Amino acid sequence: MDRPNESDDNGLHLFKYSVQQNEPIDKYFILDSKNRDYDEIKKIGKVIPYKSLKHRFLGLYAENIITSHPDNGIIYPFWGGYPYFAGLLKSNNIFLQHGILKDDISDWLNKKNMNLSFFLVSSEKEYVSIFRHHYNYDEQVIQLKGLPRYDNLQNVEDKHEIIIMPSWRRY
């Protein structure tokens, strides 16, 4: 999943890829039913409404939760009651990210706060920075794999276009 109200990040690209694979694994994409892309994504695979009873049931029994945003309030459907369910939740939390880490955000993404099973990074520098700062993950948790949405890019050589991509960042 991505954020509940978004359907354009690494979670969606991985979902599109995974439903094309012939694996006997149940795959669901969690999304707010009011999202403008909800019906389109249902054509791709199984979409579960965010905060629905089925989302809560799947949250308790999921073996893996794969997301581009690992906040407990996003991945676990027990808003406000998370402390009561924390011991019951046994899923592997796989963090795809939604970009490349530039700054040290270990205060938020450290093992004590998130306890991720896998933490995907996109570059050697990013990989090294995780161990230089205080994220406190073991080496096997941090995986240099890239971002699913970049795997979906296509090389179009015959176009002569310039893309300008402003950023909110101040560097």
In which residue ranges do the predicted regions lie?
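Active-site and donor-binding regions of nucleotide-sugar-utilizing enzymes
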Residues: 1-153
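Conserved donor-binding/catalytic core segment of Leloir-type glycosyltransferases
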Residues: 156-171
